[in-house]
Amino acid sequence: MNWITKIIKAGEKIKSAIHKRATKEDIANSDWTSCCKGPILKKDLEKNLWVCPERECNKHHRINPKQRFDILFGKNNYQIFKTPIPKDDPLDWTDSKSYKDRLKSARKKTGMDCGMMVVSGTINDIKITAVASDFDFLGASMAAAEGEAFLYGIQYAIENKTPFLCVSAGGGMRMMESLISLS
């Protein structure tokens, strides 16, 4: 056996000895997350309103709109509205990946039709209409669908004479829709 074969066989042994790395899905579905001093149970983090319990750290972890509304209104104590969704990819945008594929994977990842959730709930017996964006949906950038959701929330608040609360988790307009995202 020559020296190249020995190196290749040694490499194969090392590969088989190393366990497979966890996928993003495995990490997302885990009961644990990490912060300043190592692993933290997600249950403990949730009890502390998604802020690291370590006194020196106090890092605010990213939360999605549902988690935010659970904190704001109480667990599942609000009504989620289905908002109108305009046509996907009006400009037929493609760069390294098509915009339709990006939307499809963002919808699968978040379980939302667009990057903004519109709800109605009560705080101290005051009815409130609220919207919140989800950073996991294409960086919470605004497009026509998010604009429609935002407008729907405002119209609902005006019609029902409720305060309107907007929680933004990102910024900017989505380049894949160009000026359409501004309308």
Protein language model features and the residues they cover:
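Terminal-region recognition feature
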Residues: M1-S183
